[in-house]
C-alpha cells in the first residue's frame, strides 16, 4: 500500500485482514418513528399507579449477529422479517396487552366483546417481558427459515 508521509510516498506493509470471518452486526427497528400504541397494567404493582391501565408508544430494536455474511454480503435479509412485523402489529398496535393471571382479565375481555378494545393476552406484561417475547418470536422465525432453507442467513442469530 502506498501512503504519503510528510510529503513523501512510502511503501508501508499493512496487516492482512480477512473480512470474510468474524462477527458482523446489523440492526432493524420497528415502531421507531411513531411507536406501537398499546396499553397495559402491572396489576401486581399495587403500591403504585402502574397497576392502572396506561399507554405506551413501544419501539423495538433488534440486533442481528453472524459469523459470516451471506452470498449477498448481508447479515440479515430484512425482507424476511415480514412475519415479525405482522406479529408486532398484531400484538402491540392499538391494543391492550394483559397478563394471563390478571384478576381483571375478564373485564378487559368484556371491553373487547363490546368493540371498545383489542385485547392480547401474554404470560406476563412489561417492557422487559415484551422484549423477551420479541426475542423468542425472532428466534423461531430464524430457526424456521434455516429449516426451510429460505432467504435468511443460515449463520444469523438475534443478539
Residue ranges and their predicted role:
Residues 2-159:
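Charge-rich, low-complexity N-terminal segments
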Amino acid at each position: 500500500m502506498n501512503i504519503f508521509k510528510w510529503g513523501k510516498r512510502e511503501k508501508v506493509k499493512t496487516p492482512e485482514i480477512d473480512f470474510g470471518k468474524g462477527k458482523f452486526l446489523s440492526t432493524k427497528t420497528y415502531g421507531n418513528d411513531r411507536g406501537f400504541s398499546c396499553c397495559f397494567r402491572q396489576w401486581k404493582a399495587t403500591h403504585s399507579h402502574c397497576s392502572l391501565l396506561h399507554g405506551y408508544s413501544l419501539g423495538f430494536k433488534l440486533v442481528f449477529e453472524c459469523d459470516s455474511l451471506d452470498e449477498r454480503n448481508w447479515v440479515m435479509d430484512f425482507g424476511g422479517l415480514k412475519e415479525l412485523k405482522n406479529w408486532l402489529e398484531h400484538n402491540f398496535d392499538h391494543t391492550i396487552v394483559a397478563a394471563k393471571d390478571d384478576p381483571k382479565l375478564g373485564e378487559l375481555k368484556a371491553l373487547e366483546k363490546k368493540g371498545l378494545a383489542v385485547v392480547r393476552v401474554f404470560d406476563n406484561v412489561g417492557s422487559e417481558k415484551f422484549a423477551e417475547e420479541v426475542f423468542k418470536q425472532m428466534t423461531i422465525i430464524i430457526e424456521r427459515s434455516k429449516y426451510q432453507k429460505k432467504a435468511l442467513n443460515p449463520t444469523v442469530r438475534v443478539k
